[in-house]
Amino acid sequence: DVYKRQLHNRCRLQWKKWFGCRGLQFGRCILLDKELRLRLNSGSRVTLGDRVESDGRMSITTGYSSQLNIGSGVYFNDGAVISCLGKITIGEHTLFGPGVRIFDNNHRFSREEGVSRECTAGCITVGRSCWIASDVVLLKGTDIGDNCVIGAGCVIRGKVPAGSLVTRSGEQTTRPIETR
């Protein structure tokens, strides 16, 4: 029932704001699934626009002084993961397929010392009215313009111009979206 879901989310998010992340702001009619896992650092700033929705399991983790901005009308399908240690901005009316993973951070590593538990953070921007299909991975340094489609299974890092369709079949290709 939608009303119960909205009430549950308002109570849960208000609780997080009072006792954890004072930088949490959220709009009206938040429809997040009960299986949402929120790990918000007290020093982070998190903004959820109106009618942000998730179906099924989802995980959101923020680090100290990180910024996560999710616009109004954004939808996340089952299994989405957001790890924000730097800055992630998602434009309004963007849709995410199942299993999408968004990481604005990466472990430090070197040939001499191997992998460290320390992380480096960057930025990710996803424009308005995009469709990010199933099992896409967005890495730090990603900048996706408005009205883009990112095909299933793509790993994205770097700039994707507005109005682009990105697909993967052996090699990743980027081309303008054709009007049909």
Predicted features by range, described:
Residues 2-3:
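Short, small-residue-biased leader/transition segments that mark boundaries at the very start
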Residues 10-23:
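An amphipathic, basic-hydrophobic alpha-helix
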Residues 31:
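Conserved short histidine dyad/triad with adjacent acidic residue
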Residues 36-142, 169-180:
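Flexible, glycine/small-residue-enriched loop-and-beta-strand segment within the central core
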Residues 158:
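Short helix N-cap motif at coil->helix boundaries in the Bergerat
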